């Protein structure tokens, strides 16, 4: 059905809605009881309405005759007295002034027109909910209000007609009565979800229709009339695909409303500031070390840091000033909240980066989620299943369900470096561990490991970890929406010691940490393991024993023998030496090789210079591999001390010429990448590296941690900005990095796109953004794969994969071919009525 063919000046008979027999409309009223809204007295001529933007005509929407008026929930509610007025805190605009409402409607219509121009051809439905008075009750309705609809969006068009039959009571207290628009209107706060299908039918009464018409990402924003500080309506954005990052949409709505002298919740862009605080820098370095050790030791998918937000005074809607922060969720107004952006984070599973992005947009108040409860109590807190929270108690619950994150542990710490500053460390346990005893065992070992790495940190509540056991708060959400907490004893386990200074080597079968003595003395005993793998799970211990039995085979292969096979792939080398690839990786780790130099190098197309660079950049047990036949001068593996003052004068850039830095940068990558393998990445926001000209020293020097923290950059995933500044200085024989462009040819279904990138500066995030922009996709909705030398499609999920991919492509040609694959999410539903259950099938 073409939208231009719809007769919007007439009625919307219920028989046009094909699903009417399958659902009970929560708001059904007769034509005689049609609520009057002055907005309906405003009409536009057909010539003023362009495209898919519509506004109701003078005649109100007509519904089939029914004798009762039901509230937004499916149960009948008692009608309030006719003379009841809403609470002044709601900020409802008085209905006695039709002219004012006509002006508001005209502004909203124009604002949606601006929004439509900014979104282009996106599949999005934007509709307005406005307050009206019906039988003495104040309700929100979208009937008779302007809306905008993307092209070829029949499902959204049908969902729009469904929304016309709904009204949400502003007098109610329950979520079912208020609905999503009602909650936003009453609280004057935005609400959004990556997928409405994560709501329960009580929280979202249109859930059955959303399932039927594939409605997913939804955002609702309050609209204010600035001169009178009144909430005049709600703008609801509806999409047919999952949505993680809503900041661009909020910005577009803000600009559209500002153009017509209206406003909504704003993104408060704070100025770029540099925090040259050595104490805070040291505290974050210690926190990042703990996150890294714990995640790699126990295979945790994600660990991150929350801190109280830096507030600033902003003009409040009711007059005066209140404190706010950078989130566009205005719930932080005047309250203490926490933010996780620009702080230490460690991600093992690359697929949960979307959850990390969502955390950067949401701020948690005291008591919200596990981190909020730990912040409130200043102690330790644990929840076995955060997906059972409601959205009010944990705003990120829908994202936790999307990314299948369940068990969560948080602890509130403070550092002697920073006085009273508080840091909340949040750890998500592996989703596969669901047994209570296994969770307790893992938690006990985790606590002991953290204790071993505490230097300046301690629990805010002064709780000390006992030798054998301790108590922590365990919270649990019940089916009735209540949250209960109790103290439970946790037995402390005693894992083996891990050195504080280490360089992590990422392999799928075993995570290991090298001793600091290895990097300091540049030597290692052949065949002797100077590290241990810590894992409290019994199954992992069995694997560990079997690996030790093969130690004799590993001792027989020396570093000199390995060097002879660097030109080929790891698989070929393993086959030639008579060992399996897994054993080959362990042999490499014993010699200090964190990454195999190359896949199968095409000696014809790759010059001797490039081969020399690849081999020389591999760090062995004796530092860089000094192959005199190819290289007269080895590459150093450490950098000189860095001065903060010099770093301020360096121009920003996006890449670092040195990647293997122990105390400066932690990046774990698999020695031999494979599709679907997990990747580990640590991040802590710092200033970018200066990369113009720099001196390469020929002697070892201790790296310095005197760097300036950048608290403003919101991109938490750019590993090239991590813990480094290089001194900008001219030299007699400078090393100049040569940049050349690589053509990207990506195929998605029947579409093919082509563009060029700089291999020296591009990251996986930037590459996915370029692909998403050209194919009009969400970055979280697809993954990239490339064809390797073995003619296998390999996933590109992190910067390490991209670097390997570019190396492979450079050995063949200057064109990199990628394949774009959709990422599917498994959505659950909680339909209560039999009719909704039918539609879920």
From Swiss-Prot:
* Main location per the UniProt record: nucleus
Sequence ranges assigned to domain RWP-RK in this UniProt record: 539-624
Gene3D superfamilies from the entry? Phosphatidylinositol 3-kinase Catalytic Subunit, Chain A, domain 1
| Compartment(s) of residence | Nucleus
Compositional bias of type Polar residues: which residue ranges?
A: 651-662
Q: Which UniProt keywords apply?
A: DNA-binding, Nucleus, Transcription, Transcription regulation
- List the GO cellular component terms: nucleus
Q: Which GO terms describe its molecular function?
A: DNA-binding transcription factor activity; transcription cis-regulatory region binding
Please describe what this protein does.
Probable transcription factor.
Protein name, UniProt field = Protein NLP6
Record organism: Arabidopsis thaliana
């Amino acid at each position: 059905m073409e939208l231009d063919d719809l007769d919007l000046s007439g009625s919307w008979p219920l028989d046009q809605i094909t699903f009417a027999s399958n659902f009970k409309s929560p708001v059904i009223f007769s034509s005689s009881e049609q609520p009057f809204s002055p907005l309906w007295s405003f009409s536009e001529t057909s010539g003023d309405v362009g495209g898919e933007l519509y506004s109701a005509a003078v005649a109100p929407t007509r519904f089939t005759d029914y004798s009762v008026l039901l509230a937004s929930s499916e149960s009948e509610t008692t009608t309030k007295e006719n003379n009841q007025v809403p609470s002044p805190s709601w900020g409802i605009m008085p209905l006695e002034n039709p002219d004012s409402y006509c002006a508001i409607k005209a502004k909203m219509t124009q604002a949606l027109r601006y929004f439509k121009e900014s979104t282009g051809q996106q599949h999005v439905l934007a509709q307005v909910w406005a307050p009206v008075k019906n039988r003495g009750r104040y309700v929100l309705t979208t009937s008779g209000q302007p809306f905008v609809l993307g092209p070829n969006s029949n499902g959204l068009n049908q969902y729009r007609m469904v929304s016309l039959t709904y009204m949400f009571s502003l007098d109610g207290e329950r979520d079912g009565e208020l609905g999503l628009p009602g909650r936003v209107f009453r609280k004057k706060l935005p609400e959004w979800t990556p997928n409405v299908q994560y709501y329960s039918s009580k929280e979202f009464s249109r859930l059955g229709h959303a399932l039927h018409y594939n409605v997913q990402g939804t955002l609702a924003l309050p609209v204010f009339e600035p001169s009178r500080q009144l909430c005049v309506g709600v703008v609801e954005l509806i999409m047919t695909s999952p949505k993680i990052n809503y900041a661009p949409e909020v910005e577009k709505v803000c600009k559209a409303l500002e153009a017509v002298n209206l406003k909504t919740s704003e993104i408060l862009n704070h100025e770029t500031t540099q925090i040259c605080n050595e104490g805070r820098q040291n505290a974050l370095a210690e926190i990042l070390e703990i996150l890294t050790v714990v995640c790699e030791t126990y295979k945790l998918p994600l660990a991150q840091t929350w801190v109280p937000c830096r507030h600033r005074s902003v003009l409040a809607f009711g007059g005066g000033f209140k404190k706010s922060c950078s989130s566009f969720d205005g719930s932080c107004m005047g309250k203490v909240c926490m933010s996780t952006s620009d702080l230490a984070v460690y991600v093992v599973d690359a697929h949960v980066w979307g959850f990390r992005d969502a955390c950067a947009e949401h701020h948690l108040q005291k008591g919200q989620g596990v981190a909020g409860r730990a912040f409130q109590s200043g102690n330790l807190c644990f929840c076995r299943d955060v997906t059972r929270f409601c959205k009010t108690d944990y705003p990120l619950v829908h994202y936790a369900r999307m990314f299948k994150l369940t068990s969560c542990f948080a602890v509130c710490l403070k550092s002697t470096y920073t006085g009273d500053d508080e840091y909340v460390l949040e750890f998500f346990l592996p989703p596969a561990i669901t047994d209570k005893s296994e969770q307790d065992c893992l938690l006990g070992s985790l606590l002991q490991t953290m204790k071993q790495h505490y230097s300046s940190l301690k629990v805010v509540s002064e709780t000390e970890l006992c030798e054998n056991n301790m108590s922590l708060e365990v919270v649990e959400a019940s089916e009735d929406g209540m949250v209960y907490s109790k103290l439970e004893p946790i037995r402390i386990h005693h894992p083996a010691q891990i050195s504080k200074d280490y360089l992590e080597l990422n392999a799928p079968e075993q995570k290991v940490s090298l001793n600091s003595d290895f990097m300091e003395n540049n030597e290692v005993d052949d065949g002797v393991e100077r590290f241990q793998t810590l894992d409290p799970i019994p199954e992992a211990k069995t694997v560990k024993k079997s690996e030790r039995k093969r130690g004799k085979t590993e001792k027989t292969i020396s570093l000199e023998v390995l060097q002879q096979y660097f030109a080929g792939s790891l698989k070929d080398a393993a086959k030639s030496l008579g060992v399996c690839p897994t054993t080959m990786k362990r042999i490499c780790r014993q010699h200090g090789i964190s990454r195999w130099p190359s896949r199968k190098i095409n000696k014809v197309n790759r010059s001797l210079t490039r081969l020399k660079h690849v081999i020389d950049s591999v760090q062995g047990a004796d530092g860089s591999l000094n192959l005199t036949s190819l290289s007269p001068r080895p590459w150093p593996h450490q950098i000189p001390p860095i001065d903060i003052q010099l770093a301020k004068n360096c121009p920003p850039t996006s890449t670092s010429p040195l990647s293997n830095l122990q105390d400066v940068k932690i990046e774990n990558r698999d020695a031999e990448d494979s599709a679907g393998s997990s990747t580990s990445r640590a991040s802590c926001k710092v200033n970018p590296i200066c990369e113009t000209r720099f001196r390469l020293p020929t002697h070892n020097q201790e790296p310095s941690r005197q760097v300036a923290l950048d608290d403003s950059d919101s991109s938490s995933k750019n590993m090239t900005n991590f813990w480094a500044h290089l001194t900008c200085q001219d030299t007699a024989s400078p090393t100049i990095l040569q940049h050349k462009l690589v053509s990207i040819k990506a195929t998605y279904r029947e579409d093919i796109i082509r563009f060029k990138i700089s291999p020296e500066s591009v990251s996986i995030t930037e590459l996915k953004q370029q692909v998403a922009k050209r194919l009009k996709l969400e970055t979280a909705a697809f993954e990239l794969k490339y064809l390797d030398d073995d003619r296998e499609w390999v996933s590109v999920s992190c910067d390490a994969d991209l670097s390997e991919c570019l190396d492979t492509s450079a050995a063949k040609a200057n064109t990199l071919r990628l394949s774009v694959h959709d990422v599917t999410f498994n959505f659950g539903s909680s339909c209560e009525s039999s009719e909704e259950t039918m539609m879920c099938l």
